[in-house]
């Protein structure tokens, strides 16, 4: 027998003494749900007793091909017997049965992703015991039919719609509108119907444990078998599609496994003094300090999140007849939990005939807006300190605050309203299924997923959609919780929308308007409204709580007490981006890609320079480019007055500025067919020959970067002259321009040395011409492994290093980014060959090259500064490594990633202090 403990108890014994064996620190052992059930038990909250099967058991079971580890089943049987003794009831007992729930619980919160079974232990005998115990036949038969339905779907994979259709038919026959109006006799008949559905749709060969009658499997009668199959199903659900999608989205390892929680049932469906609900200690949408959530009278827990019936607000619980005392106790529990966890808590509870039971708590998911407000107010309340507040905000979540909103200056009329379930606005075409959402999105269409209510199988469509709209469900429904977690705008509970997914239409109560697939609508998840047609959207502004958190973050990241500050710059190619980045808190420009200034109308000018044989034409093109580029730099440097602006010389191969040769070939053929003159055709053919002559077989490793400065020096030197001239003129105007020139794609020290000599000569010429002393640093962009290896040599001749981690990743791996991401990186990640996409999160080997180059450069030239301007400069995970492992001075990212980078840089500083 294994020495590994696989089962942990929680709750009290028959005498009320706590026998809990775990606590909240054990989430990797017991899963988040199990650890928090143990913690609530330890602090004296009312928790139904139970036991937790460890995550490691799931890992070993799955890893062995769904074979139980040695001794595991024996421990589970012993835990069952212990729970029966504690509760004074027995599973399957015909007089006073113990019923249990079986729930998953991963180490990290995965709301709605995993499967649950309630009322396990019911069979034809124990249902009679439940009737005798409760004197409530309707409740007993309702519990039994729910169990068969859940067990058949979750454990055996029977289509849930088969049961819903039978339930609908039962309502029609009985002449009632809702399930709660069905009689005990109706429900007893439904139990037999559900058993028949089970027998007709379960393959006996797949489940040799099941009894077979007339070739059909019989619904399992033995509670021991029910429990074992349910636990195995929860283990199996860890690798189902929707769980894998969620983990991939949130960076959760597939190798953690899930725990299983077996817990005595508390019934919220025992009549009008019973209820079930989901609540938060604060508002998870905006952070308001108020009790927030939904409850349903005479219902079971899954009814709330499934959105089957519209819920009541938690504030009404204290005034609901028969539930007043439980409502008051729940508010006291809210305060206890928040004080204990020092965070907003998400709670599931059941009230059984006036008695409150806590079924779950966890640190609650929240919108970015709510996260900021809660963190700030908890600092003000003395629950946490500023550093902890900064550490609690997920940098990636700040993207939510930058989501578009409806343009307030434009008029629009709401077609319908619902609940403001997840903030932000979205515009898109109506689609009615997850598959259609994915298909249309892949074709380049923006879509709004419109559903009666979502379920976990809709996740891929929710990910693909710009926004989500449901006609049912509350603010804690599946749609609301998942949308908030993804930062996707969502409006729930739009009751005027009567959705017919089969016909793909929405009929709107009180309106003649009928929405069909492909119609465009706009939704505002902040206001909870739906608008017919497209509404203009505007970007959100950084104000209020975000400014407060980011100001705290800046204080932390710019602190030089324990080393250099963690600076944040921006990649900006025009004054508009630069100005926006300053609003977002960028300190300087870390990368200005000058080639972007040659696009649009200016493309013809650079094409004249590249393709012409006439030296006069080439020089005129250079003069024209010098003029427009000088104007660009004047605007850029003026915007960034007093701040560094790193200007990268021309980097891409020249053919990127030319026409596509194959498209030009087609155009020539068409002109020939149309009878164009030989003179016109000759010009085009000459152009095609020149372009073909410039095509390289591997252009990204060809004539580009510093190699252009060596082979075709006129173009990059024109850029140096433009930058120096702009700086000189601004100095004379009293502006403080601070340009820095960066030489790209250097791999050989002599490349940089020779290019720097020419750059300095041009700067000196401009200084004399303009009568202004210029001091423009010249640095190197390290994008190749060889450059990192000889960084100490290059550092003798460079004022700074900036790492282009996009190309450094390509050349370290030997990957072509576009090809790799399109063709095999997703497969590599699926097969766990790669943990992350190395173009999104910096690879350890690439990070080591950066670290080594920084170390070499700093040893040679202690006054150098070091930065990163690749995509990794905006990735929170990469930012921590770049500062704490590679020891760079700054990261540079796109304007909209600047707030995220500021926060991540502060968190990197805090992490470094903790590990010092």
Pin down the residues of each PLM region.
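Intrinsically disordered, low-complexity regulatory segments
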Residues: 435, 495-497, 547-553, 573-575
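Short, ordered loop/turn segments at secondary-structure junctions
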Residues: 52, 56-58, 454, 473-475, ...
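Short alpha-helix capping/helix-loop boundary micro-motifs
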Residues: 336, 504-511
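Conserved alpha/beta-domain cores
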Residues: 103-104, 542, 554-916
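Nucleotide/phosphate-binding sheet-loop regions of phosphoryl- and nucleotidyl-transfer enzymes
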Residues: 1-413, 439, 445-448, 455-460, ...
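Short, compositionally biased
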Residues: 382, 531-551
């Amino acid at each position: 027998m294994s020495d590994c403990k696989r089962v942990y108890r929680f709750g009290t014994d028959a005498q009320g003494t706590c026998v809990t064996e775990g606590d909240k620190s054990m989430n990797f052992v017991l899963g988040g749900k199990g650890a928090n059930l143990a913690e609530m038990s330890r602090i004296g909250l009312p928790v139904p007793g139970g036991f937790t099967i460890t995550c490691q058991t799931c890992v070993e079971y799955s890893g062995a091909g769904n074979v139980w580890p040695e001794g595991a089943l024996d421990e589970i049987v012993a835990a069952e017997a212990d729970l029966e003794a504690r509760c004074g009831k027995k599973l399957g007992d015909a007089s006073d049965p113990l019923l249990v729930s079986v729930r998953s619980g991963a180490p990290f919160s995965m709301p709605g992703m995993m499967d649950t079974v309630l009322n396990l232990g019911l069979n034809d005998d124990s249902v009679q015991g439940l009737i005798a115990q409760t004197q409530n036949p309707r409740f007993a038969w309702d519990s039994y039919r729910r169990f068969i339905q859940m067990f058949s779907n979750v454990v055996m994979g029977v289509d849930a719609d088969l049961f819903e259709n039978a339930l609908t038919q039962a309502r029609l026959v009985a002449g009632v509108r809702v399930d709660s109006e069905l009689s005990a006799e109706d429900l007893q008949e439904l139990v037999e119907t559900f058993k028949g559905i089970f027998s007709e749709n379960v393959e006996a060969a797949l489940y040799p444990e099941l009894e077979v009658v007339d070739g059909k499997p019989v619904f399992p009668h033995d509670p021991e078998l029910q429990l074992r199959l349910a636990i195995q199903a929860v283990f199996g659900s860890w690798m189902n599609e929707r769980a894998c999608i969620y983990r991939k989205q949130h960076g959760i390892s597939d190798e953690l496994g899930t725990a299983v929680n077996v817990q005595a049932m508390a019934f919220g469906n025992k009549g009008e003094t019973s209820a079930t609900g989901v609540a938060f200690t604060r508002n998870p949408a905006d952070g308001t300090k108020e009790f927030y959530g939904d409850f349903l009278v005479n219902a079971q827990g899954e009814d709330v999140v499934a959105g089957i019936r519209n819920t009541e607000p938690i504030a009404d619980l204290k005034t609901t007849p028969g539930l007043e005392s439980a409502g008051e106790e729940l508010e006291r529990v809210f305060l206890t939990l928040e004080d204990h966890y020092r965070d907003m808590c998400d709670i599931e509870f059941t009230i059984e005939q006036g008695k409150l039971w806590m079924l779950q708590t966890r640190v609650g998911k929240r919108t970015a807006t709510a996260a900021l407000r809660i963190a700030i107010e908890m600092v003000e309340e003395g629950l946490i300190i500023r550093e902890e507040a900064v550490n609690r905000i997920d940098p990636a979540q700040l993207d939510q605050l930058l989501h578009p909103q409806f343009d307030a200056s434009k008029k629009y009329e709401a077609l319908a309203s619902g609940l403001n379930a997840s903030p932000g606005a979205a515009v898109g075409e109506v689609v009615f299924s997850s598959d259609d959402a994915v298909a249309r999105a892949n074709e380049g269409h923006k879509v709004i997923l419109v559903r009666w209510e979502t379920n976990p199988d809709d996740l891929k469509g929710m990910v693909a959609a710009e926004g989500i709209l449901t006609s049912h469900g509350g603010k804690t429904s599946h749609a609301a919780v998942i949308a908030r977690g993804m930062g996707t705008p969502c409006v729930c509970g739009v009751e005027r929308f009567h959705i017919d997914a089969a016909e793909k239409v929405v009929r709107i109560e009180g309106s003649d308007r009928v929405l069909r697939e492909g119609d465009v609508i706009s939704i505002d998840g902040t206001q909870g409204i739906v608008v017919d047609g497209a509404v203009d959207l505007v970007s959100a502004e950084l104000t209020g709580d975000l400014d407060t958190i980011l100001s705290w973050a800046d204080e932390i990241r710019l602190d030089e007490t324990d080393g250099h500050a963690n600076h944040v710059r921006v990649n900006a190619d025009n004054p508009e981006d630069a100005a926006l980045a300053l609003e977002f808190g960028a300190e300087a420009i870390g990368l200005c890609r000058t080639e972007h200034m040659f696009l649009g109308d200016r493309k013809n000018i650079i094409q004249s320079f590249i393709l012409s044989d006439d030296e006069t034409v080439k020089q005129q093109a250079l003069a024209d480019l010098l003029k427009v580029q000088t104007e660009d730099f004047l605007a850029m440097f003026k915007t960034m007055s007093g701040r560094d602006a790193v200007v990268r010389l021309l980097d891409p191969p020249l053919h990127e500025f030319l026409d596509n040769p194959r498209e030009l070939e087609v155009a020539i053929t068409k002109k020939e067919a149309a009878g164009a003159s030989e003179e016109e055709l000759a010009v085009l053919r000459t152009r095609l020959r020149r372009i073909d002559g410039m095509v390289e077989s591997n252009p990204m490793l060809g004539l580009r970067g510093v190699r252009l400065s060596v082979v075709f020096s006129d173009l990059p030197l024109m850029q140096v002259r433009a930058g120096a001239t702009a700086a000189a003129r601004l100095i004379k105007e009293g502006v403080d321009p601070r340009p820095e020139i960066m030489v790209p794609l250097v791999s050989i020290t002599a490349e940089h040395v020779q290019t720097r000599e020419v750059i300095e000569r041009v700067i000196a010429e401009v200084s004399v011409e303009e009568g202004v002393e210029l001091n423009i640093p010249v640095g190197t962009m390290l994008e190749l492994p060889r450059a990192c290896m000889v960084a100490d040599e290059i550092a003798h001749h460079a004022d700074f290093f900036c790492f282009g981690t996009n190309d450094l990743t390509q050349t370290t791996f030997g990957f072509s980014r576009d090809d790799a991401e399109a063709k095999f990186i997703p497969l590599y990640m699926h097969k766990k060959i790669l943990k992350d996409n190395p173009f999104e999160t910096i690879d350890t080997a690439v990070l080591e090259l950066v670290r080594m180059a920084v170390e070499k450069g700093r040893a040679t030239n202690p006054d150098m500064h070091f930065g990163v301007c690749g995509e990794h400069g905006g990735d929170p995970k990469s930012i921590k490594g770049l500062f704490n492992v590679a020891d760079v001075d700054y990261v540079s990212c796109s304007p909209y990633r600047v707030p995220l980078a500021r926060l991540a840089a502060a968190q990197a500083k805090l992490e470094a202090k903790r590990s010092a």
